From Swiss-Prot:
Keywords: Activator, ATP-binding, Chromosome, Cytoplasm, Hydrolase, Kinase, Nucleotide-binding, Nucleus, Phosphoprotein, Serine/threonine-protein kinase, Telomere, Transcription, Transcription regulation, Transferase, tRNA processing. GO terms for cellular component: chromosome, telomeric region; cytosol; EKC/KEOPS complex; nucleus. This is EKC/KEOPS complex subunit bud32. The gene is bud32. This protein is considered an atypical serine/threonine kinase, because it lacks the conventional structural elements necessary for the substrate recognition as well as a lysine residue that in all other serine/threonine kinases participates in the catalytic event. BUD32 has protein kinase activity in vitro, but in the context of the EKC/KEOPS complex, the catalytic subunit KAE1 switches the activity of BUD32 from kinase into ATPase. It comes from Aspergillus clavatus (strain ATCC 1007 / CBS 513.65 / DSM 816 / NCTC 3887 / NRRL 1 / QM 1276 / 107).
Amino acid sequence: MSSAEPYTPPPLPSPFTNTTPPPQLLTQGAEAHLYKTVFLSPSTPAALKVRPSKPYRHPILDRRLTRQRILQEARCLVKLVREGVNVPAVLALDWEGQNTEKGFGGAWLMMEWVEGLVVRVVLERWERWMKRNQGSSGAEELKEEENWVRDLLRRIGRAVGALHKAGVIHGDLTTSNLILRPPGHVGEQADTGESSPSMEGDVVLIDFGLASQSLQDEDRAVDLYVLERAFGSTHPRTEPFFEEVLNGYRESYKGASSALKRLEDVRMRGRKRSMIG
């Protein structure tokens, strides 16, 4: 059997085809590619999100949808920065609506680069450390570790509360879309396996590709439900502490009570769907 051919991303938008150093591809999704690049000077890192054109769509519809989605994401980010929510700042954006060549016609959004680890990685490291040390560490040390993770979850809840207070719905709230930015914005922490990961720092929300502006409690509740399900499927040791997320949510958002009441309804519908299959 022949090996699969290496993935070749679509061409970069024209402003970045001759950038030195070239943008570094970090992740690729169905709708967008994320690169690490620089902004104005080599010493200023930036995140570049590229939405390539879709060759299977009619060109006019493709340009309209791509432009609409990149603008919606940028508007949500600008609004959140203005409201003091921890999200990447928008540095620049553009779309190539007049370029109908194959591989172009897409759009791009350049944002502030956020140092740190995604919360998913932090919690996975913490859970591995807890599993290794469950029998060898004392009760006080394990309790202290639990307190650290509880505090992190409360900060996550406060970040989501600030998001919803500003009238923005994330649309894809998972621990992969949260970054723990360490104090002083230092680089990534190495995983030595010898100690539990640091949980100090600010929680920054990222990836607003599915975000929208809404004041509906139903939308807020669905956001929270998606995050709750993400904990259940990805972080089994941390899931029992999820109530701390909701406690932090209550602390930062005065309208939390009605949103959390609606969350109960959303949970009920989710359980019914699971039973029906």
